[in-house]
């Protein structure tokens, strides 16, 4: 299920030649996704909760029209165990922006982006939602902890100016998917000593996409 056309979300679709790949019809046209295993979605199943258009993909899995970040942007909601897991792509780049009600820094339609974020926040306010961001480690932490968002209780964040860069942890974070490379989990091998062709285990990006934690 592809939320939007940007390369950091679609760049390795070729790795799944036998999978059905769902994307909104608008994104399929924009990204020229015209292959036998690509399924354009038209959101013909009517409203889902407070969202106006949706498509049921499987039992408990829904594709939701959520324009703004791109003109054909979508979100995925998976229902399980009384929780609603929201894979939102880049409706917000960080969880802090969700809590602060701030738009993504990238959008193709600012009016649609505002409407989508308002709808996302309204949904979260009435459904126990695990918010799965893709550009911050919080997405994976939320998933592992099955932590539902409480918009009235934002997580504590530390201003950049207060971070003690001198106390290096040896950890590096992938700027694309949020994967944390911890030498302690890799036989003590420092990130700097990894081979040049090393790839992120999660998104397969190169070392140049990593920043010091």
Describe each model-derived feature in a short phrase.
Residues 140-161:
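Short, electropositive alpha-helical surface patch
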Residues 168-170, 196:
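Short metal-coordination and nucleic-acid-contact micro-motifs, chiefly zinc-binding Cys/His arrays
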Residues 186-198:
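Short linker/helix segments within small regulatory modules
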Residues 183-184, 209-212:
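Short, non-ligating residues that shape and space the ligands of small metal-coordination modules
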Residues 1-23:
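Active-site metal-binding motif and surrounding structural segment of the metallo-beta-lactamase
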Residues 174-177, 200-203:
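Short cysteine-rich clusters marking metal-coordination/redox-active sites
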Residues 15, 20-67, 71-143:
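Metallo-beta-lactamase
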